Curated annotation (Swiss-Prot):
Propeptide: 23-88, 118-124
Keyword Ribosomal protein applies: no
PROSITE patterns: CYCLOTIDE (PS51052), CYCLOTIDE_MOEBIUS (PS60009)
Protein name: Kalata-B1
Highest taxon above the source species: Eukaryota
Disulfide bonds: 93-107, 97-109, 102-114
Gene: OAK1
Entry domain remark: The presence of a 'disulfide through disulfide knot' structurally defines this protein as a knottin.
Keyword Cell division tagged: no
GO process annotations (BP): defense response to bacterium; killing of cells of another organism
């Protein structure tokens, strides 16, 4: 929902920009501007997917390393990952805060979006 809201806001801003300055821009400039914005939005979406994949992969490797070392500790793999890489509040849970609460387990409200306290479970 948050990504949709941001996309809608960008489209409205683009429409306002083109409407306000449209007479000063040629059709080729308008097309170039729209194409550049669309390309940047696509790149952002791709990078978000890569980031989520990397976080999950690193968490799995750290968990396996800890299992192989047979360290006797009460820390979970999520806590170790947070301490070593200082990733606090990542990744985004994929929902917006409603009344300061989040429906997804393990997520807290970091207005306007819900963020995880730790990492997604390895089964996800």
């Amino acid at each position: 929902m948050a990504k949709f809201t941001v996309c809608l806001l960008l489209c409205l801003l683009l429409a306002a920009f083109v409407g306000a300055f449209g007479s000063e821009l040629s059709d080729s400039h308008k097309t170039t501007l729209v194409n550049e914005i669309a390309e940047k939005m696509l790149q952002r979406k791709i990078l978000d997917g890569v980031e989520a994949t990397l976080v999950t992969d690193v968490a799995e490797k750290m968990f396996l390393r800890k299992m192989k070392a047979e360290a006797k500790t009460s820390e979970t793999a999520d806590q170790v990952f947070l301490k070593q890489l200082q990733l606090k509040g990542l990744p985004v849970c994929g929902e917006t805060c409603v009344g300061g609460t989040c429906n997804t387990p393990g997520c807290t409200c970091s207005w306007p979006v819900c963020t995880r306290n730790g990492l997604p479970s390895l089964a996800a």
